[in-house]
Design a protein with these regions (language model features):
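Cytosolic catalytic domains that perform sulfur/thiol-centered chemistry
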Residues: 1-285
Length: 285
């Protein structure tokens, strides 16, 4: 049995003690301080974990006037990264984050699936859940895996939505395109990382924070199904597209739908930061 959406702290502890083909990834990241995750990892991490940096491992080159702030890397580049982590065809990958468990972890989950690896799960509740349960942390450097695994990418482009499709369906009824940033970002308020404020014209709001309970773990599949059934309004899950500021946190909604037994939702990787590079694309507050 593999874990393909979420894994609890106790399940991860058991996995570490009973299985050998397991790769743990630390994806901690802070938008205001991109070096913070690297420093936090060096100070303390789950034993055996390796670093998965949003800035260097999980993002490709920015093309001015074309891409958003966090484009996916080329599949061949990410394949090499996955191999360097020691991931093979049957490896169970577990990824964790801080700050209620989700900043970049859900993006890693989606990227692993995009490149063809299903045995990947996010630590439910993130590092706070692991630490509050009393499980160990270490500052010891993790030895690089040897030999490098022979993971071969099998890209699934259907897991993502491109800008042309988003532009085509954004005014559909019922709503198909949803902004994951929360009410402030949706309405162009609060702190912004892009020069234009607002949201894609016609998009609905699907605040990613609503997928979590007060303790930072995901709501139950039953609760999430009710939540997403209201958003879908009778549509198939595969009709739904989520975006955010730069294609990172929107993956949390995709993961939550999968956890709820509603597979097929997609993420628009370019998100708001790509949408606004073309002044002819419509926006609203």
């Amino acid at each position: 049995m593999s874990f393909q959406t979420l894994i609890t702290a106790s399940e991860l502890d058991h996995l570490c003690r009973t299985e050998t083909d397991v790769v743990i990834l630390d994806a901690r990241f802070h938008l205001d301080n991109e070096d913070w995750g690297d420093r936090a990892f060096a100070e303390s991490h789950i034993p055996g974990a390796q670093r998965a940096s949003l800035a260097t491992d999980l993002s490709g080159p920015i093309i001015e006037g074309v891409t958003g702030r966090r484009p996916f890397p080329a599949s061949a580049d990410f394949e090499r990264t996955v191999r360097s982590w020691g991931v093979g065809p049957s490896t169970q990958v577990v990824v964790y984050d801080a700050d209620r468990g989700l900043m970049a972890a859900s993006r890693v989950w989606l990227m692993m699936r995009w490149i063809g690896h299903d045995a990947v799960a996010v630590l439910d509740g993130g590092l706070p859940a692991w630490e509050s349960a009393g499980y160990p942390m270490t500052a010891e450097a993790t030895s690089p895996p040897a030999p490098e695994q022979t993971f071969v990418a099998s890209v699934r482009p259907h897991l993502l939505a491109e800008v042309d499709e988003v532009d085509r369906v954004r005014v559909d009824t019922p709503i198909r395109v949803f902004d994951s940033r929360g009410p402030e970002g949706y309405h162009g308020q609060g702190k912004y990382y892009d020069p234009v404020r607002g949201h894609i014209k016609g998009a609905g709001l699907a605040d990613r924070a609503e997928t979590l309970d007060d303790d930072g773990t995901f709501r139950s599949p039953e609760d999430l199904r009710v939540h997403y059934d209201a958003l879908r309004n009778g549509q198939d899950a595969g009709e739904i597209i989520f975006y955010c500021g730069s294609g990172v946190t929107a993956a949390q909604n995709v993961l939550a739908m999968e956890h709820a037994g509603l597979p097929g939702a997609r993420m628009y990787v370019g998100s708001w930061s790509e949408w606004i590079v073309d002044p002819d694309r419509e926006v609203e507050l």
